[in-house]
From Swiss-Prot:
Organism in which the protein naturally occurs: Caenorhabditis elegans
Domain named ShKT: residues: 472-506, 516-550, 591-625, 634-667
Keywords assigned by UniProt, alphabetized: Copper, Disulfide bond, Metal-binding, Monooxygenase, Oxidoreductase, Repeat, Signal
Database matches in InterPro entries: Di-copper_centre_dom_sf, ShKT_dom, Tyrosinase/Hemocyanin, Tyrosinase_Cu-bd
Stated family: Belongs to the tyrosinase family.
Pfam family, one: Tyrosinase
Listed name of the protein: Putative tyrosinase-like protein tyr-3
PANTHER family for this protein: TYROSINASE FAMILY MEMBER (PTHR11474), TYROSINASE-LIKE PROTEIN TYR-3-RELATED (PTHR11474:SF114)
Cofactor binding remark: Binds 2 copper ions per subunit.
Entry superkingdom: Eukaryota
Length: 693
């Protein structure tokens, strides 16, 4: 009872603090989306991303970097084809061949641009994943606000879904390596007089439009909630994407209007905006209705994945047209708890996809290495827009592509010879079927999966390959000794993530007590490619034999103790922006940034390139701890700030401008801060040049 009272009080406080008034939404559909976004934000804020400070167990004489190695320990962590090739047991690296079939970078096409063979194989791959349980296990992730806090209601919405969709595409490619996850451009359906007339809602494509889906390739799919079938209510409310919505997104110049604060609270400097991508993406959800209407059930419907593939395409179009290559990987709104939950902070873990962080979803590697997008269908391809399922509409202003209509569709307004009716003709303003009747898709034999799947738990995905590989690894060779000293209980926030195997957060398929062994099938290959030196922490723990680490035990290497805060002789240099000074001891037990430039340094990747300094001096910006104050606004983060400011500490102590913003009068926006920190870089370089002379 007490727990429910606390939650009720929290939600009442949230209502008071929220500056988002859903009653002002421009349409009923956006109002529905607004309420859903607000509910998700409430629940996510009630389940913080970190439950306490992350304190790395110490090693005598060493500064421990609280960061993961870039080695992919399971297939979902892969970011290039060479990595996928290893897990798919193929040959050829980036020119991979798996069981005689090529495995390469894919080009995602619009769903109606697929050939009949491609579409049928895609449907079969979805059915295979449904039958073996992998579809449902991934779909459940989208419903878990406590485990997937960054999925909605803030700036991580687009990066989080990019990774989520990537994982479904990997599952599809495990069934058929030549396939990709197409995108559904709902504007093609919206361009019809009545979008419900689209052939999308027929046996050949998505099946029933209303009620339970009992025909088509996904008929009688039991949902993760154990309902007998997917449900839809196409066109009851909402609509598909419009060109105006797309152009509004592509025309933005402020990243905070793309990676947007969709549920801001009072005090957030960004006002509510119902035109940001998270809101406009909701229209097609509500238009399809049924399971797609609610966040918790949307992923039951396969059209969810194609819709989010299109959302990802729009984001990539923005990235390519408005951002430089470098900016694509760094531009992210400033962390501010008055604007979003901590789950959306730049350096927060992208749960449940740890060890990824939200900023990792900005990586160019997705579209450099894994997939690209075919252009949206265009009338430049001719009267059929390049597909037998589309046509070029010349009767409603500028030529535009639209999807063809099923029998009884309203074709009366097409006056310029368009072939708008699929396998039929327009008679008296209605589509009439011709001599060819639309037939159900042919039955095809299930494709033999490239990999097989074993379930280890209900909450996380583990892939079992033909040569069986686990994803249960420690990230550091000291995890075992730390665990033996009780760190799993003393320091669970760090240990349960970085030392999963030793803290029994998962079940390894190897003998964790062996001192000299290779725990991963790929250890020998990684050793030959230099990973023992590039990624010594992970490799020294999991590839000890291949890295020739057997001559010294883990316990001998990891002698000493204490926490990261007690490290007295760190050797890591600070960022170049820190006036060229050596690192100082990490002696602050509190959760603060020590420098006003920490957010900018974090944006520039210093948390990873220089973790020894950053995880000590920039704890908040690097996601190392959870502050017990509201980080982000123009405020004082310590109750003594005013007194310290009166004593002149604002000019003496670099800690003050960051944490006593109001008392020190150092409130700046992200652009001003970036300029200020850039000046420090120039000054540092100038002083270094003088010293050299």
């Amino acid at each position: 009872m007490i727990r429910y009272i606390i939650l009720l009080v929290y939600f009442l406080i949230f209502e008071v603090n929220s500056q988002l008034d859903c009653s002002k939404a421009p349409t009923p559909a956006i109002r529905i989306m607004c309420n859903q976004i607000q509910r998700w934000d409430q629940k996510a804020r009630a389940t913080p991303s970190l439950s306490g400070d992350v304190k790395t167990p110490g090693i005598a004489g060493k500064a421990m970097a609280a960061e993961f190695s870039p080695i992919a320990s399971n297939v979902f962590q892969c970011m290039d084809i060479a990595c996928l090739c290893v897990f798919f047991r193929g040959t050829g690296g980036n020119n991979c061949v798996v069981q005689g079939r090529p495995l390469g970078k894919v080009v995602r096409k619009e769903y109606r641009m697929l050939s009949d063979d491609e579409r049928q194989r895609l449907h079969q791959a979805f059915r295979t994943l449904k039958q073996n349980g992998e579809y449902d296990r991934l779909a459940r992730v989208h419903a878990q606000y406590s485990e997937s806090g960054a999925a909605h209601s803030g700036p991580a919405f687009l990066p989080w879904h990019r990774e989520f969709v990537k994982r479904m595409e990997f599952l599809i490619r495990q069934v058929d390596p030549s396939l990709h996850l197409p995108y559904w451009d709902s504007s093609l359906d919206q361009n019809l007089p009545d979008s419900k007339d689209s052939i999308l809602w027929t046996n050949e494509f998505m099946g029933d439009a209303n009620g339970e889906v009992n025909n088509g390739p996904f008929r009688s799919w039991k949902t993760v909630e154990n309902k007998p079938a997917i449900t839809r209510a196409v066109g009851a409310q909402g609509k598909g994407y419009s060109e105006d919505e797309i152009n509004t997104m592509l025309g933005q110049t402020d990243i905070a209007q793309v990676l947007a604060f969709s549920a801001p609270q009072r005090g957030c400097p960004y006002q509510p905006n119902f035109n940001v991508p998270e809101y406009t993406h909701g229209n097609p959800h509500i238009y399809v209705g049924g399971d797609m209407l609610e966040t918790s059930t949307a992923a039951n419907d396969p059209i969810f994945w194609m819709h989010h593939s299109f959302v990802d395409l729009l984001w990539e179009m923005y990235r390519q047209s408005k951002q430089t290559r470098a900016t694509r990987e760094t531009a992210y709104p400033a962390d501010n708890r008055q604007c979003s939950s901590e789950h959306h902070f730049r350096a927060a873990f992208m749960r449940p996809f740890t060890p990824m962080r939200n900023a990792d979803g900005l990586s160019n590697m997705y579209t450099d290495n894994l997939y690209s997008y075919a252009p949206r269908p265009s009338c430049n391809a001719g009267p059929t827009c390049g597909s037998p399922y589309l046509f070029c509409d010349k009767s409603h202003g500028a030529p535009r592509c639209a999807v063809r209509m099923k029998p009884e569709g309203n074709c009366a307004s097409f006056k310029n010879g368009e072939d708008a009716c699929y396998q039929g003709s327009c008679q008296s303003g209605k589509c009439v079927a011709g001599s060819q009747n639309v037939t159900p898709p042919p039955t095809i034999q299930p494709t033999k999966p490239v990999v097989t799947v074993e379930v280890f738990s209900e909450t996380c995905l583990k892939i079992r390959l033909k040569f069986f590989q686990t994803s249960c690894f420690n990230e550091n060779e000291c995890c075992g000794p730390w665990s033996a000293k009780g760190e799993c209980q003393k320091n669970p926030v760090y240990m349960n993530v970085w030392c999963k195997a030793s803290c029994r957060q998962c079940t390894p398929n190897y003998n964790i007590n062996e001192e000299c062994s290779d725990r991963h099938t790929n250890c020998a290959m990684w050793s030959r490619s230099g990973e023992c030196n590039k990624n010594p922490l992970w490799m020294s723990e999991n590839c000890r034999s291949s890295c020739q680490k057997c001559g010294r035990s883990r316990a001998a290497t990891c002698g000493g103790g204490g926490g990261a805060d007690s490290i007295s002789n760190p050797t890591t240099m600070p960022p170049a922006t820190n006036n060229g000074q050596q690192n100082t001891p990490c002696d602050s037990p509190m959760c603060y940034n020590e420098d006003q430039c920490c957010p900018i340094w974090a944006q520039r990747g210093q948390c990873r390139s220089n973790p020894g300094y950053m995880t000590c001096q920039c704890k908040v910006s690097c996601g190392v701890c959870r502050p017990n104050y509201v980080y982000g606004p123009c405020a004082d983060y310590h109750y003594d700030c005013a007194a310290w400011a009166r004593r002149g500490e604002c000019l003496k102590n670099k800690w003050m401008p960051e944490n006593c913003r109001r008392s020190c009068n150092t409130c700046v926006n992200q652009q001003q801060l970036a300029a200020r920190c850039a000046t420090r870089i120039v000054r540092s370089a100038f002083l270094e040049l003088i010293r050299m002379k």
